[in-house]
Amino acid sequence: FEQYTTALEMTLLAKGERGKKEALSKRVAVLLESDTQKIQDLYNKMKDFYRYRSESLHEGNGQNITVSELKDLEEIVRRVLVKYLEFCKVAIQTAPTVTWDTIKRDKISDLKNSVSTVISSGILPA
């Protein structure tokens, strides 16, 4: 469970970024969903998953994580990575010498803009 959330953090968060749970939950939701209810549902699910991850990592209590939740998170990570690879492919085709750091920075910027739009629309909390 912790490895999956770490993979999401490394992909969707800037180094040293604060408010990881909120930022990660919002970015995953807007990256993977477009329907209002699905965005809200995934946002809430990711917040729960991040809380489970924190409890498991910091308190050594991973008993609250079910097999179903583990499979859900695995599928979310798979979907995020597929979307990211598609974004990378387009970026490399456009600029063959682009670096991972630039691609990541650009994608995070895109996601921040998407999150701002969704917050402005009242779909997610500020």
Which role fits each region the language model picked out?
Residues 1-126:
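Amphipathic, oligomerization/interface secondary-structure segments
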